[in-house]
């Protein structure tokens, strides 16, 4: 039941002093034309009803605090609770964005220090912390690309090259910025085919969007050559930082030749994510693009920290105020807590865990591409259909009954029946071994009775959804019964 369905007319969870009721007149504070004419359709519940309702929902929810969460390309690592305490300090949590600059110098220092550290980690020259999510960062980067070529007078550059192994939001972000997306095929080893890239490069190409390692978990070993090809053509090279967790302290996007980078603080730098946010997708650029960053940017002068707005070619604001500040605080705390050596070690263990799990699982389900991976890997689930009579979806649904969150499935699209698995560095060997045992048990079940696995899950509040009806007759908002 929803909280609305538990509503009982007249039931409340609070009372106001009788003598104060007549003193509180909304019209004293809110213009008449903005006052509601009718009561809002809010649920009427007692405090204990509300507490019990949401406590029950938490029992039905699943998070990295509950167990293994191996969603590929999502980096569902554990989020240190110390970071939450730091972000909740009153000096941070009670700030208001309209406070005078001289009174929020500490907050600006946090932002400036994070910008500086992210530049050092990625090899960029400047950063903005405004974007509220990864895809928002992508759009920001693409708008910078667009403005850059407008200023140069190269308006013929209307295309963005995206490999078929790209992170899912790349083509959408490029399209939203007004570019035509050109997809190029990967080669048999799962990385960019240089011949295909060369054939696609011409004076109409504004940028190439890449993730490295790519979404298959494979490092684009020809990245230096790709950067040379792009820059020789006058094309910018864009780095999707979704998979930065694999290479921290080992190699920097800026050193590979990338001009623009977006990061996901809610992934790589261990701030909570899922259920829509809050996230943070900072964008970094090389020196020749600094003047195109959105305003304002935090800068340090002899008088203190300022919000700089006089960038000559800025794309303008891309979000209200200054980004999701609480996420920024948590990310800075995480980086300072680990330090350079700690971040490097985190990437090393992330890659080690992925390769250990890949090696063990490949004995049950073949990998899509052979050889070592980075932070994640993709299994080819066509064997499930041929030998066990089940699909990747069935395996994923049955995992729920064992208390394990399924990996990403059916992505990337270039692998049929794909399972994309990213264990992250915060899981121990016992948890990885348990996951392997769960997969083994499910395959044994499928061998004996495929239909049993096909009808899973059995232990969850919601069973199999009618996906056909859901797609053809979607209900995306709550409607009161009387309507």
UniProtKB/Swiss-Prot annotation:
<keyword id="KW-0663">Pyridoxal phosphate</keyword>
<dbReference type="InterPro" id="IPR049315">
    <property type="entry name" value="GDC-P_N"/>
</dbReference>
<protein>
    <recommendedName>
        <fullName>Probable glycine dehydrogenase (decarboxylating) subunit 2</fullName>
        <ecNumber>1.4.4.2</ecNumber>
    </recommendedName>
</protein>
<dbReference type="Pfam" id="PF02347">
    <property type="entry name" value="GDC-P"/>
</dbReference>
<dbReference type="InterPro" id="IPR015422">
    <property type="entry name" value="PyrdxlP-dep_Trfase_small"/>
</dbReference>
<comment type="subunit">
    <text>The glycine cleavage system is composed of four proteins: P, T, L and H. In this organism, the P 'protein' is a heterodimer of two subunits.</text>
</comment>
<dbReference type="Pfam" id="PF21478">
    <property type="entry name" value="GcvP2_C"/>
</dbReference>
<dbReference type="InterPro" id="IPR015421">
    <property type="entry name" value="PyrdxlP-dep_Trfase_major"/>
</dbReference>
<dbReference type="GO" id="GO:0019464">
    <property type="term" value="P:glycine decarboxylation via glycine cleavage system"/>
</dbReference>
<dbReference type="InterPro" id="IPR023012">
    <property type="entry name" value="GcvPB"/>
</dbReference>
<dbReference type="GO" id="GO:0004375">
    <property type="term" value="F:glycine dehydrogenase (decarboxylating) activity"/>
</dbReference>
<dbReference type="InterPro" id="IPR049316">
    <property type="entry name" value="GDC-P_C"/>
</dbReference>
<keyword id="KW-0560">Oxidoreductase</keyword>
<dbReference type="GO" id="GO:0005829">
    <property type="term" value="C:cytosol"/>
</dbReference>
<dbReference type="InterPro" id="IPR015424">
    <property type="entry name" value="PyrdxlP-dep_Trfase"/>
</dbReference>
<feature type="modified residue" description="N6-(pyridoxal phosphate)lysine">
    <location>
        <position position="267"/>
    </location>
</feature>
<comment type="function">
    <text>The glycine cleavage system catalyzes the degradation of glycine. The P protein binds the alpha-amino group of glycine through its pyridoxal phosphate cofactor; CO(2) is released and the remaining methylamine moiety is then transferred to the lipoamide cofactor of the H protein.</text>
</comment>
<dbReference type="GO" id="GO:0016594">
    <property type="term" value="F:glycine binding"/>
</dbReference>
<dbReference type="GO" id="GO:0005960">
    <property type="term" value="C:glycine cleavage complex"/>
</dbReference>
<dbReference type="InterPro" id="IPR020581">
    <property type="entry name" value="GDC_P"/>
</dbReference>
<dbReference type="GO" id="GO:0030170">
    <property type="term" value="F:pyridoxal phosphate binding"/>
</dbReference>
<comment type="similarity">
    <text>Belongs to the GcvP family. C-terminal subunit subfamily.</text>
</comment>
